[in-house]
Amino acid sequence: MELKNHKKIIILGSGPAGYTAAIYSSRANLNPLLITGINKGGQLMNTNEIENWPGDFKKITGPELMNRMHEHSLKFKTEIVYDNIISVEFKKKPFFLLGEYNKYTCDAVIIATGANPRYLGLSSENKFKGKGISTCAVCDGFFYKNKEIAVVGGGNTAIEETLYLSNFVKKIYLIHRRNNFKAEKILIDRLLKIVKTKKVILHLNSTIEDILGNNKGVTHLLIKNKNLKEKKKLKIAVSGLFVAIGYIPNTDIFTDQLKMKDGYIKIKKGTHGNYTQTNIPGVFAAGDVIDHVYRQAITSSASGCMAALDSERYLNSLS
């Protein structure tokens, strides 16, 4: 492996948080190195249309937005490397990162490796991702106006997605593998009010067995009720499926280095700056690796900006 030159700061990840951190770090003359990771561009690369990015009132695709961020970071001379980090050493300085192709050292790190949605694990899911299967109602819900769709999940996220979608879709089939929801009572109460209107149809103790469709996208779901002894499956017609069964942060390689909670990196927070610092000085985190609540492109970008500013202050303190 070739040993790369030492860098003041390395940014891991090429989603909104990573690119924003790169832009701010570059403008601060820190000459950052951004390592893209496996999924260049992050989750937005699977989003067909974005209508809630401030200033872009005309439709823009996820890949288009990420390409613009990529070009923006290059404008300010960010060095971008296509590699995937497989192990790190943060317990001594300089920090050491081992990639699939090269080795890297640096004085500061911003972790923006993102989080991937947890899917059902059906073989038919990959076929319809971006063509009827979504993991973000706020991002894609509007495109199902006056259509019948399904939501799968039983926690806060699933119910929140259902409540949001109920504002403009025709009907929602909410599918949950258990008999009871694992969500806040206030959310369940709101859900049950809508259930009474028959706009939301509950399928409890049920699982999705298969996803059917054509070249245009999803058309039907096959679901099975676990309480029924017969093996017959119910076929329901839907235009889309929103999967809301949780997220998996891309933080496995940091588990023995950083403090975490449920796979998400814990940061300092507070009101006196250094908000994005982890338990190790010089290691900062931004985007979906620290956020299991909002998970929006704009909130990821905001935290990427904060991490860049925090890391700049840290590096200045070393000189």
From Swiss-Prot:
Cofactors that this protein relies on: FAD
Reactions it catalyzes: [thioredoxin]-dithiol + NADP(+) = [thioredoxin]-disulfide + NADPH + H(+)
Disulfide bridge map: 136-139
Keyword set includes Disulfide bond: yes
Main location: cytoplasm
Cellular localization per UniProt: Cytoplasm
Pfam assignment, any one: Pyr_redox_2
Record-level GO cellular component terms: cytoplasm
GO molecular function: thioredoxin-disulfide reductase (NADPH) activity
Residues noted as binding FAD in the record, renumbered to the chain: 36-43, 288-297
Assembly description: Homodimer.
PANTHER family the record matches: THIOREDOXIN REDUCTASE 1-RELATED-RELATED
Membership in a protein family: Belongs to the class-II pyridine nucleotide-disulfide oxidoreductase family.
Protein known as: Thioredoxin reductase
This protein's encoding gene: trxB
